A protein has these predicted regions:
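C-terminal soluble interaction/assembly domains
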Residues: 253-308, 314, 320-323, 346-348
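Short hydrophobic-aromatic micro-motifs
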Residues: 37-41, 103, 144-157, 303
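Hydrophobic membrane-insertion alpha-helices, especially the h-region
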Residues: 2-17
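One face of beta-strands
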Residues: 37-39, 103-105, 229-231, 239-247, ...
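Short, low-complexity cationic-aromatic patches
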Residues: 29-32, 90-99, 138-150, 235-239, ...
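An internal, short helix-loop-strand segment that often contains or flanks glycine-aspartate motifs
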Residues: 46-82, 125-239, 254-255, 268, ...
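Long, low-complexity, Ser/Thr/Gly/Pro-rich intrinsically disordered segments that act as flexible linkers
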Residues: 19-126, 130, 143
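Beta-strand-dominated lipid-handling architectures at cellular/organellar boundaries
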Residues: 115-117, 241-243, 257, 270-271
Length: 351
């Protein structure tokens, strides 16, 4: 009898663990440290929808070209998933706050070749729990990198080495479904199923709008966010690429004001003729911006849009989209008078 009870308990525990894990955030996200914002990108479906990684780029930065030559790893082709933890800095003695990042990258790479390359760049290699941590100087900071498995790497430019050590500790416990940053544990259930790009972020009160790239909000809209609000943004493919941004505020009044402000921006955007690379109006870009809508749901503002696949492909494969009035024909500039003409004019006046 006790054997039967033990089997039932063990089976129940396994089923519970499987169910919890199936509802947990992706593995890459669960390895991240505590942070102010989390950003996740799944590149595998993006490659199916676009030409990303299918054609070698015409030009590469020489430093990146050398990285590819020595490691055999191309981000466009070989990176499958990426998770980023964003750590907002604090201004000290008049110096502006510096945002730091920790990341988990999953893909296909040769551990031996990548390890040899990192060792050449590192000023120090620390051994921690059977893993090498490479300390690499980059722009007056130290970037620490660790190869966690045959398809997973961790990196962080946070000052404390404890951050990447904690990521290694999390990797050791990756089978458990309860790990991950508090933001993810609390709000990941709000991310729509099948999202290929999503972020959960608390906007920094000290950062400028242009420094809030992790919020996935267009243009300067992130500058309108109420203090201490929270943003959940996501994109997932159906007939089009669906975008959704939930801005969670502290009150219905805050949500109403933000909704009205964004609504004003939407009216302005929809009144413009959208052009791509100065080539005239683009129907896919226009369709994307025409689909933008915002509404209030109690203490939240909800922004939605549907992006045509054609526009999605343009974003990843063509020059940047220019948002603004369509280019107008310019009148030719008047030609300057020649010295001979000036002398003739002077003589006629003298007569």
């Amino acid at each position: 009898m006790w054997v039967a009870v033990a089997i039932v308990v063990i089976a129940g525990g396994i089923v519970t663990a499987v169910l919890l894990r199936s509802r947990a955030a992706p593995d890459a996200v669960r390895l991240l440290p505590e942070s102010d914002a989390v950003l996740y990108v799944n590149l595998e479906p993006i490659r199916l929808l676009t030409d990303l990684g299918k054609k070698p780029p015409k030009e590469r930065d020489p430093q990146y070209e050398e990285f590819v030559r020595q490691t055999g790893f191309e981000f466009e082709r070989d990176l499958d998933k990426a998770a980023f933890a964003i750590h907002y800095g604090v201004a000290v003695k008049g110096k502006p706050a510096e945002t730091r990042y920790s990341e988990i990258l999953q893909g296909h790479f040769d551990s031996a070749r990548v390890g040899d390359y990192l060792r050449k760049l590192a000023t120090q290699v620390e051994r921690y729990r059977d893993y090498d941590i490479y300390d690499i100087p980059v722009e007056e900071r130290t970037v620490r990198v660790a190869l966690l498995g045959f398809d997973t790497a961790a990196a962080s430019n946070v000052d404390s080495p404890e951050v990447i050590r904690g990521m290694i500790d999390s990797y050791k416990q990756a089978a458990l479904p309860f790990t991950g940053p508090a933001l993810v544990s609390q709000y990941y259930r709000r991310v729509p199923l099948g999202s290929i790009v999503w972020t959960i972020a608390r906007p920094s009160a000290n950062s400028a709008a242009q420094d809030r790239g992790e919020l996935l909000l267009p243009g300067s809209w992130s500058g309108l966010l109420p203090r201490a609000s929270l943003v959940i943004a996501s994109a997932w493919p159906l007939n089009d690429v669906h975008l959704r941004v939930n801005v969670i505020t502290h009150s219905a009044d805050e949500a109403r004001r933000f909704t009205e402000q964004v609504g004003t921006y939407l009216m302005l955007f929809k009144s413009l003729e959208i052009s791509v690379d100065a080539g005239g109006p683009d129907k896919d870009v226009k369709a994307a911006f025409d689909s933008l809508e915002v509404h209030q749901d109690k203490s939240e503002a909800v922004l939605t849009a549907k992006v045509p696949y054609a526009f999605f492909k343009k974003v990843l494969s063509e020059p940047p989209v220019e948002l603004g009035p369509a280019p107008q024909k310019q009148e030719p500039a008047p030609q300057p008078e020649t010295p001979t003409a000036k002398r003739k004019t002077s003589k006629s006046k003298a007569k």
